[in-house]
Amino acid sequence: MTIQELHTHAMELAEQADFLNMQGKDAEAKSLYEQSLQAEKEAAYQARNQQIGEPSESVLFRSAASLAYGLKDFREAERFICMGLAGNPPLDVAHELRELYDQVSLERNLEQMNMNLPENQHEAVTITIPVKERNLLKVLVRKFGWACVF
């Protein structure tokens, strides 16, 4: 398959997996997400090996990293993020890769600290975060669904 065909196939599989997820068919969805990741991974590595250039290469690695992140394969997600940043991605893609890296790092740290709390164990907390730490705050808000006042 060509790079474009692999990428298209990966996105179709991910879309099917999303649909299954909405139906509560988690095991079937996970299987499709894994197949999607394999296709996107192959597309990304083919793109890099064939040196098709930017932004295509970094976008494919970002996509593969997102799929790995969704599957909670944080180490694999980190690898794809690094591969995407190792090229010469456009600034916006590099920014997205770094934001995804922040999310992956947070998840890995929480996993290592065994802090995955059940939904019903959330509580109200007030914190002050310096302006330069806003990206971390965004990650925390997305992860935990926190309400924030800026």
Stretch-by-stretch model annotation:
Residues 1, 112-150:
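Helical anchoring/docking segments at protein termini
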Residues 1-3, 42-54, 87-94:
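Flexible helix-coil transition and linker loops at the boundaries of alpha-helical arrays
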Residues 2, 14, 21, 28, ...:
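Hydrophobic/aromatic side-chain positions at a characteristic register within alpha-helices
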Residues 2, 9, 28-29, 36, ...:
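Residues that mark the junctions of alpha-helical repeat units in TPR/alpha-solenoid scaffolds
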Residues 6, 13, 20, 60-61, ...:
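TPR repeat positional signature
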Residues 19-20, 39-42, 46-47, 67, ...:
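Residue position in alpha-helical solenoids
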Residues 29-42, 74-76:
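Helix-turn-helix repeat elements of alpha-solenoid scaffolds
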Residues 52-74, 100-123:
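Alpha-helical linker/edge segments of TPR/alpha-solenoid repeat scaffolds
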